[in-house]
Amino acid sequence: LVTFFAAILWANVATAAVFHSRSEIADLAFPDCDRVETRDVFLSPEQRERIEHAAGSALDGALITIYEGYSGDRLVGYAMLDSHLVRTLSETLLVVLDASGAVAATYVMAFHEPPDYLPGDRWLGLFHDRRLSDDLRVGRAIVGIRNDSSWPGP
């Protein structure tokens, strides 16, 4: 019995993957920028409520970290980490926005579900050039990830 539970625990640990660390955020999000500034923002209850309503999901807390990339004095864009549950385990994405607020890139930083549920580049690309709107969610402009043969794959 102990061996069985140890095998289950090992299987869950074995599927966890960290692809990038926080120290890589600047290079991933803003490879051509000469500086990246980090700002911690404490959201007011009203700001948090607006964000949660727009996103259709709850935030983990009121403190968010925003990374800002600059080329000289020109703001190139923003980046933020988004950690959430996939099924029962978490993933962390790095979402990069250009200066106008459109999605410039999305990176999987860490993924703790089995690899079959890992979003591929093709799926992450569905977010590219999109802005926050009611259509920017799974089931509308974004198709869900499926781990069966009917999904066209990444």
Give the role of each language-model region.
Residues V2-T92, D98-P154:
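Intrinsically disordered terminal and processing segments
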